[in-house]
Amino acid sequence: MPLKNYTKTTSKKEPKQLDIAASDQQIEQWSDQIHKLDKAIRSTIDNSRLFYDAWRCMVCIAPSVTASWISLYRQLPPEKQPAASVGTLVDWNKALERQRREVLLALQNFHVIVIAPCKEVKGYVKKAVEMIKRRDKKVKELEKIQKELLVVYELPDPETKKSKIKALQSQLVRVNGELDDLQKHLTLSFPTLIAKSRVFFGQLMKHFYCLQLQMFRKMHNIVRPWDCFQDDIPQTWLVEFSSVCQAAESISLIAVNNNRPPVELPKSGDVLSNREWEAGKIDAMNSLIAQNLHTSASQVSLSPMASTASSSVTNSPVDTHTPSTPIMSRPPSMKALSSGVESQDESVASSNFQVPIISNPLFKSPAPYSPTSVISNHSSTGKSLVISEWAYLASGSANVVFEYVGKNPYFQDKVIRLRRRGQVFTTEQVYEYYQNVIYPLFAGMESFLIEVFLQPVTRDFLLAAQNASGIYLNLNEQYCLVMKDLKDGIEMKPKWLTQSPAAPPDWVVCRTCALSRMRGRPVGFCPLQLDFNNWPKFLCCLQGFVSPDIAMRLFQSGILRKLRDLQEQYSRTDVALAMTLRDVTLYIGKDHITLLDLDPKDMNTKMSKWERDERNLIEGGWYYGRGMKSTDKACRSSIK
């Protein structure tokens, strides 16, 4: 029996055509925006390269110039030398070399974080520019045909006139059809291209200016106007800084609103009053240069309308919001001990367009923390500190950590944590908050909390520690915190284990995943998918992030369940405490799990940022799944 060949016919689906095209006026507006973006991104690439080359040149010639100056200084007669000694100049040169290494480390990834994204945005803009050129070409062709028709209508011969009109009309119909199709395609693709380019460009500008501020602060820490260094070398460096800033200022931000104040260098000798600080009339660069070395940064504050980069100046007078590179190579887990106010993931402001202002606050602000009801007796070690026995380890936005390198058995495997200048809470208040607020919350689970002790410190010790680290400390502190030196482990930030109370009722994505997508960061595991009653589901959620044995330890310990319950309990009654519990770090060692970063939050400086983040998440559609890929799973589907 012969076999029959059966062929399966597949029907091809016609692509869905857009029936409505945007008006010519709207297309012209889009074209104008695209051309401005194209000009801005090209300027960004040129100035970014200038920025990179200028800083490379600066950090390479600075040590040699300083060494030459020291050599000339030594040749001066003693009676003509300034107040500083040669030893002070050598120490200054060593600090400069350390800052130079940090600048070079930060510049290593410059092409990845600035130049490469610039080229990616340029690719988006290039596609739009090509479509604009195609449309302009069709419009000119259409106008040419229309002019030829006007000439043909004036011909005396009817037969010639009729044939030419017929030919031109067919051309007119063809060009009109092509122009309509192109107009529909522009209507479909232009808003997406413009929005994507704007968002990408805004984020790029944010990273570029943060890097610029970081470079400036690391180097300017060395040339800050000391009493004995009012000479030509710092002035020369300030001129170089000015040229770099002017090159960056030539970048046009176009329609992108990143809330960045203008960056200008003040004249030499400018002094800013507290009234100017409070009025918010100064930007990040001015505040950095004009800051008095002998005035505590806690006495001044920026306006709430200032940018994130500007507000970070008072929190971190030397480094930017990112921790500075440690001098000694140590595990990254130690950096968590120094991040006492806020993690980096919660500290970077998002770059958005114009956002409608919500009059009612999204959070209910509780009464500020007051140390009047704290315990009166402090736990003190009773040991004295010698700076030669402590080595700088790491620094964060609020604290600086030193490790013990001496021979006293009491301090073996210990670190001390010193407060940076400009912090709201003192070490004593942080300790009392930890003992009176945090410890009672974890009754029965105290083994997960790190044991801390108050250690008296002197002003001389703080000055020596400040010189050793190159970071300004609060010299009015009377105590520091002593704690165990955690080594050989991994860190994990569980973040929001419950949904934000400000999320819309019909939300699709949890707060943690929504914030990651809004900031363009990889989305990790969803905290809402952690099933504390089902081990297979719990392991499946953490698969790829931690090993199965660590997941089992987390599951059996119950610490994540406890954090979730506490976050839910205080999410509406005590926002500051709830945010502290959401910002904790889990340090997972070989034989223990420890909670870190449980310092109090300053509601006066943090509330506006938290509300701004919630507005951006809600009004940007991030809670509804914006930015999700086809393979991503909705967080709400995991809720029972």
UniProtKB/Swiss-Prot annotation:
The catalytic activity of this protein is classed by the Enzyme Commission as 2.7.1.158
Question: Can you list the GO cellular component terms from the UniProt entry?
Answer: cytosol; nucleus
**GO process terms (BP):** inositol phosphate biosynthetic process; phosphatidylinositol biosynthetic process
Q: Sorted alphabetically, which keywords does the UniProt record give?
A: ATP-binding, Kinase, Nucleotide-binding, Nucleus, Phosphoprotein, Transferase
Q: Where is this motif: EXKPK motif?
A: 491-495
Q: Where is the composition biased (Low complexity)?
A: 304-314
| Catalyzed reactions per annotation | 1D-myo-inositol 1,3,4,5,6-pentakisphosphate + ATP = 1D-myo-inositol hexakisphosphate + ADP + H(+)
- Give the subcellular location: Nucleus
Q: Which InterPro entries match?
A: AH/BAR_dom_sf, Ins_P5_2-kin, IP5_2-K_N_lobe
Q: What is known of its domains?
A: The EXKPK motif is conserved in inositol-pentakisphosphate 2-kinases of both family 1 and 2.
Q: State the similarity comment.
A: Belongs to the IPK1 type 1 family.
**PANTHER family reported in the protein's UniProt record:** INOSITOL POLYPHOSPHATE KINASE 1, INOSITOL-PENTAKISPHOSPHATE 2-KINASE
Give the protein name, as stated in the record. Inositol-pentakisphosphate 2-kinase
Organism listed in the record: Schizosaccharomyces pombe (strain 972 / ATCC 24843) (Fission yeast)
